[in-house]
Amino acid sequence: MPSLWSNESDGSLREHLVDVVVSGSEPKIRVHDLTRVADDGSRILKGVTIDIPKGMIVGVIGPSGSGKSTFLRSLNRLWEPPESTVFLDGEDITNVDVIALRRRVGMLFQLPVLFQGTVADNVRYGPNLRGEKLSDEEVYKLLSLADLDASFAKKTGAELSVGQAQRVALARTLANEPEVLLLDEPTSALDPISTENIEDVIVKLKKQRGITTVIVSHSIKQIQKVADIVCLVVDGEIVEVLKPSELSHATHPMAQRFLQLSS
């Protein structure tokens, strides 16, 4: 059975994960010994090894500067990982055409960036690049998935709140029919109501489309709400992998301190 953690030397963690990972689940993403070295020689990521099962929402939390965003961006080659370190459905992503990869592995950032034109123009952007035309009904359906009604289709970015713009950016990403969603602090700039809307959409996408999701967040409450599994990252390493309900059981000293200060 594949686990979320593949460090053979840490038997206690592997045994614990028997109860965390769904039996028989296959990894959608496999990361093996992923390391990134900064220009000054320091290591941003230190041999990260993890399996992410298909259809799960994996939360990634930890102190600022611990390597969370670097890890996330390596999964769709926004940061180019070394060969044979990141695999999607068993295939080394460095061998996959980068445009095709980013269609399969979509990403949403902290601040939404919309293109000129209407909301509908934004949603159609990816399909248009592929020579595909989305009907109005298809646009409305994608907006609905992002918790926006059809009336938004004709609006421009200037008419939207930041929370609404973030949901348009999500609908635009969904138009590419991604198998995986990478979310880099997607609600940190949003008000509580908009944050709740995005969280509800994340859970809905898992239930309705089975999308595998990796979300980086500083909000413990958010991760406990949406995630199936939580990875705690400290100093470039995944030091704990727990169920959301078990975060209080973290044993790594820095992870414990982060959780205490964040709660």
From Swiss-Prot:
PANTHER family: ABC TRANSPORTER I FAMILY MEMBER 17. This is ABC transporter I family member 17. CDD domains: ABC_PstB_phosphate_transporter (cd03260). ATP binds at G62, P63, S64, G65, S66, G67, K68, S69. Residues 29-260 form the ABC transporter domain. The gene is ABCI17. GO terms for molecular function: ATP binding; ATP hydrolysis activity; phosphate transmembrane transporter activity. Belongs to the ABC transporter superfamily. ABCI family. InterPro entries: AAA+_ATPase, ABC_transporter-like_ATP-bd, ABC_transporter-like_CS, P-loop_NTPase, PstB-like. The keyword Endoplasmic reticulum does not apply. It comes from Arabidopsis thaliana. The lineage of its organism: Eukaryota, Viridiplantae, Streptophyta, Embryophyta, Tracheophyta. Keywords: ATP-binding, Nucleotide-binding, Transport. One of its GO terms (biological process) is phosphate ion transmembrane transport. It comes from the Eukaryota. PROSITE patterns: ABC_TRANSPORTER_1 (PS00211), ABC_TRANSPORTER_2 (PS50893).
